[in-house]
Regions:
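Non-transmembrane alpha-helical segments in soluble domains
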Residues: 29, 33, 54, 58, ...
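C-terminal beta-strand-rich structural cap/linker in extracellular carbohydrate-active enzymes
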Residues: 186, 218-244
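Metal-dependent polysaccharide deacetylase catalytic core of the NodB/CE4 family, i.e.
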Residues: 1-54, 61, 71-88, 114-115, ...
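Beta-rich interaction/scaffold domains
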Residues: 239-286
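A Trp-anchored, charged/polar loop motif used as the substrate-binding/catalytic surface
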Residues: 92-109, 125
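Sec-exported extracytoplasmic/periplasmic mature domains
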Residues: 30-37, 108-111, 136-140, 270-274
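Extracytoplasmic/secreted proteins, especially bacterial periplasmic and envelope-associated proteins
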Residues: 20-23, 27, 31, 52, ...
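C-terminal domain-boundary segment and adjacent tail
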Residues: 62-79, 104, 111, 116-194, ...
Length: 286
């Protein structure tokens, strides 16, 4: 339901033999493609610091980027120059109580020097819930509202599209029309972008719409990270599965109208662009 996927541990006893690990990448990929209706795996999250997995991944073309526990590049989102293909990126592992200090230390640095806080977690408990609540209240919707929390796969695709998408603009009277070409790679799943329109007064914008390929759409007032210049921020998503996800969770709510199921249904419906379909789904969960 929109989450990222990646290779991690594979089912081999030969955990130090790259050829065996690679063979299991191939067999695991077949299972993933079958179970996820054609969606494939293109990332490796290195398990237990085992560099044999890295060697195996470098001989398996579908794996396009690797996240390491140590020895990788530090990801600085405001200083990324390329599309991160075949890049080794370092991730972090912290207990939830330590994460706020890690985040605050990065926020104190100049924008271009800030490292992404890449958090690995194998299970959750009350301490994780408390940390996530702090994150929301400080930097999320109920705080500064400057937080983005993508999976590694989603960030990789977003950065790839930032570097390779082609945006064409056309102005007709009071209407700005954007045509965006987004080239995808092998097993890409997240055809979505945010476009910051400088020189456009957000207060003067009365409506934003998208064509048939756009399934999710939102817009609002934003500012650039470097100099704080005001911009009209347009977020759009072309995932065909967005509508199917929304319909699924609305049906789950109708079968069992609990508060939790209602929250799930509203969450997925809210992702959709304004449309007759969205209105029909909202009426089913009011």
């Amino acid at each position: 339901y929109g989450v990222g996927i990646a290779f991690h541990d594979v089912n081999t006893l030969s955990v130090d033999v790259p050829d065996s690990i690679r063979a299991h990448f191939v067999s695991s990929q077949r299972i993933v493609l079958d179970r996820l209706a054609g969606r494939g795996c293109k990332m490796l999250i290195e398990p237990n610091g085992n560099k044999a997995y890295v060697a195996a991944a470098e001989g398996y073309d579908p794996i396009q980027t690797i996240f390491l526990q140590s020895g990788g590049e530090k990801l600085r989102p405001f200083a990324v120059n390329g599309d991160l293909l075949r890049t080794r990126i370092e991730r972090g592992l912290w207990l939830p109580a330590a994460i706020p200090a890690v985040i605050e230390a990065q926020m104190a640095r100049p924008v271009e020097e800030r490292e992404a806080v890449n958090i690995g977690v194998h299970g959750t408990d009350r301490f994780w819930s408390e940390m996530l609540l702090w994150l929301n209240n400080t930097y999320g919707r109920d705080g500064e509202d400057c937080l983005w929390m993508p999976a590694a796969e989603e960030y990789f695709e977003y950065n790839y599209l930032r570097h390779h998408a082609v945006v064409n603009a056309r102005v007709t009277e009071n209407t700005l029309t954007l045509t965006v070409e987004m080239p995808g790679g092998l097993y890409f799943y997240y055809p979505s972008l945010t476009i910051n329109l400088l020189g456009v007064d957000p207060g003067a914008c009365t409506a934003v719409g998208g064509g048939e390929t756009v399934t999710g759409l939102s817009w609002g007032r934003g500012r650039t990270a470097d100099d704080g210049a005001e911009a009209l921020m347009v977020n759009f998503d072309c995932r065909h599965a967005l509508v199917a996800h929304a319909e699924h969770f609305v049906a789950v709510y109708e079968a069992d109208p609990s508060a939790a199921n209602r929250a799930d249904a509203r969450y997925f419906v809210a992702m959709l662009k304004d449309s007759d379909c969205k209105e029909r789904l909202l009426k089913r969960i009011k």
